[in-house]
Swiss-Prot record:
Belongs to the paramyxoviruses nucleocapsid family. Its main location: virion. It is found in: Virion; Host cytoplasm. This is Nucleoprotein. Residues 405-517 are annotated as: Ntail.
Length: 517
């Protein structure tokens, strides 16, 4: 029997391995699009010209009249300006099954009177029409930088801070857009300016060169439509982390942004491991958590098999990234979130009200996290030499810190709880509770969740397999008001028949007690 159970425990990981390592077939190339990339030639030496070209690339990438592949090419051209050999940069990091990059040089000819003396050319020929298209008049639908609204002069910044700092400020912001562009597009603008603040405080990004919100949204839309651009940026991070140590200041700043990009879209997976498994509480022995634990073990093997690209599987849209959705291990995720909201106050703002939330496991996680005994790690007792007296005092302190009120946190965000209320039983426990009107429920939407669950009744929600990562943009207070109104409506539906029945009973009793004349 033990062998049979062992086979079942390893089935998920072995099944995934057999699918991913199935028989080799013929390699059939897919369709590839051609993307034009422009690099600076040796004749472009003036810093003002270089900064002008960089802002020209940025402006073209935001031009909605151009195809997204062209706009993506201009962003690649901008990113390549950070390197002394853009061709080598693209050869190292730009190998992609979707696109083929065609490189054009931009040279400066002092004899030319039009297009500011710039000419687009290759080794064999010059491209006059392309030059006109690239450097011709453009109408920006909105300012590129917030400083343009304040009439700030980029040339002045160039004189004060120098070309590398100005170019670095622009390129770093493009990288910051990637942090939220793929996994949380709804919160892109807010997330961008939150991440940018650290770079503004340390002087990396000057105020006059801060992107406008429209610029951020425009770059984000290009990234979402051009997976080849995202792949290039990820490969750049992988190369920095594994193959180089002599990084420039700009590359070090890119690495800092890369730390925000790592494991983007995998917050639920990582939090389940952190709060659900690594806490090593006794609840993990429950049989209904066993399938989810096996699933998580299989996902860990899959994650590690991806090597240095593992932290970017969601951004790269790896075919396996959907397997990491919490809907694939709902009971363990719900339990982990219960532990998390008790142990980490910041996690109380995390969106837990999802369609696959198992309310019973969510409350169980909170209960075991509050239990003073479960907070003590037996594995470290002997190693640290903790005495029984010390453990007793520690339990006393933990119990006093818990407050002893037994209040449970309610799920935040999402529509899962609202959906469940239509089918949930509402316990009208006491007379005082029954006399409370609907206005009282709406005014204190958290009261019902703050009481311990009575009668052993839990609202349990299951289902959903799609990836729903961090969606913190929805107004939680608005959701709570809607939940309170829904509860009030349900309560009124239950109370009205009871009140009518009570009125009829009182009427009958009154007639029976009135003496006949």
């Amino acid at each position: 029997m033990a062998g049979l159970l062992s086979t079942f425990d390893t089935f998920s990981s072995r099944r995934s391995e057999s699918i991913n390592k199935s028989g080799r077939g013929a390699v059939i190339p897919g369709q590839r699009s051609t993307v034009s990339v422009f690099v600076l030639g040796l004749s472009v030496t003036d810093d003002a010209d270089k900064l002008f070209i960089a802002t020209t690339f940025l402006a073209h990438s935001l031009d909605t009249d151009k195809r997204h592949s062209q706009r993506g090419g201009f962003l690649v051209s901008l990113l390549a300006m950070a390197y002394s050999s853009p061709e080598l940069y693209l050869t190292t990091n730009g190998v992609n099954a979707d696109v083929k990059y065609v490189i054009y040089n931009i040279e400066k000819d002092p004899k030319r009177t039009k297009t500011d003396g710039f000419i687009v050319k290759t080794r064999d020929m010059e491209y006059e029409r392309t030059t006109e298209w690239l450097f011709g008049p453009m109408v920006n639908k909105s300012p590129l930088f917030q400083g343009q609204r304040d009439a700030a002069d980029p040339d002045t910044l160039l004189q004060i801070y120098g070309y590398p700092a100005c170019l670095g400020a622009i390129i770093v912001q493009v990288w910051i857009v990637l942090v939220k562009a793929i996994t949380s597009s709804a919160g892109l603008r807010k997330g961008f300016f939150n991440r940018l603040e650290a770079f503004r405080q340390d002087g990396t990004v000057k105020g006059a060169l801060v992107f406008t919100g429209e610029t951020v949204e425009g770059i984000g839309s290009v990234m979402r439509s051009q997976q080849s651009l995202v792949s290039l940026m990820v490969e750049t991070l992988v190369t920095m982390n594994t193959a180089r140590s002599d990084l420039t200041t700009l590359e070090k700043n890119i690495q800092i942004v890369g730390n925000y990009i790592r494991d983007a879209g995998l917050a639920s997976f990582m939090n389940t491991i952190k709060y659900g498994v690594e806490t090593k509480m006794a609840a993990l022995t429950l049989s209904n958590l066993r399938p989810d634990i096996n699933k998580l073990r299989s996902l860990i093997d899959t994650y590690l098999s991806k090597g240095p690209r593992a932290p970017f599987i969601c951004i790269l849209k790896d075919p396996v990234h959907g397997e990491f959705a919490p809907g694939n291990y709902p009971a363990l995720w719900s339990y982990a979130m219960g532990v998390a909201v008790v142990q980490n106050k910041a996690m109380q703002q995390y969106v837990t009200g999802r369609t696959y939330l198992d309310m019973e496991m969510f409350l169980l996680g909170q209960a075991v996290a509050k239990d003073a005994e479960s907070k003590i790690s037996s594995a470290l007792e002997d190693e640290l030499g903790v005495t029984e007296a010390a453990k007793g005092r520690l339990r006393h302190h933990l119990a006093s810190l818990s407050g002893g009120n037994g209040a449970y946190r309610k799920p935040t965000g999402g529509g899962a709880i609202e959906v469940a209320l239509d089918n949930a039983d509402i316990d009208l426990e006491t007379k005082a509770h029954a006399d409370q009107d609907a206005r009282g429920w709406g005014g204190d939407s958290g009261e019902r969740w703050a009481r311990q669950v009575s009668g052993g009744h839990f609202v349990t929600l299951h289902g959903a397999e799609r990836l729903e990562e961090e969606t913190n943009d929805e107004d939680v207070s608005d959701i709570e008001r809607r939940i309170a109104m829904r509860l009030a409506e349900r309560r009124q539906e239950i109370l009205q028949p009871m009140e009518m029945k009570a009125a009829i009973t009182v009427s009958i009793m009154t007639k029976m007690t009135i003496p006949q004349q």
